[in-house]
Regions:
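Intrinsically disordered, low-complexity regulatory regions
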Residues: 1-132
Length: 132
């Protein structure tokens, strides 16, 4: 059987990490929206700046906030995982402090509205920095 984790398709660098975005999805039992956010926070693409990722993260958070305003959340919050395991999982990623905060908000804040709003604010800060 082919080792699909030994390479990636496209310009992302997931395969060079011990823990890939798939591992985060499975460990934290993420819904599709949160899995997409996690992927965008973790990835580095040789062909793109982070600007587009931050814009997409902000957009996805906006959609989740819209869903939450419409009624009860159809998705469960991420499964709690000990912080020490989280720290081990991100160890070989060169995350900016803002990116780590994005991930922590996504994975650990139980108030989902607060999590998504915080993430939008962090993205606004990163977008402003990248455009300056």
């Amino acid at each position: 059987m082919e080792n699909v984790r030994s390479y990636n398709v496209g310009a992302s660098d997931y395969s060079k990490h011990k823990y890939q975005s798939w591992d985060f999805w499975l460990t934290f039992v993420l819904n599709p929206f949160d899995a997409d956010l996690c992927k965008r926070i973790l990835r580095t693409k040789a062909t793109d700046t982070r600007l587009l990722d931050y814009q997409k993260i902000k957009h996805i958070c906006g959609e989740r906030l819209r869903q939450l305003e419409e009624g009860p959340d159809k998705w469960v919050s991420p499964k709690y995982v000990e912080k020490s395991h989280f720290e081990e999982m991100i160890l070989d990623y060169s995350l900016l402090e803002d990116d780590k905060q994005l991930l922590e908000n996504l994975l650990y804040l139980q108030n989902r509205k607060e999590a998504y709003k915080n993430m939008q604010n962090i993205c606004d800060k990163r977008i402003a920095y990248l455009l300056s």
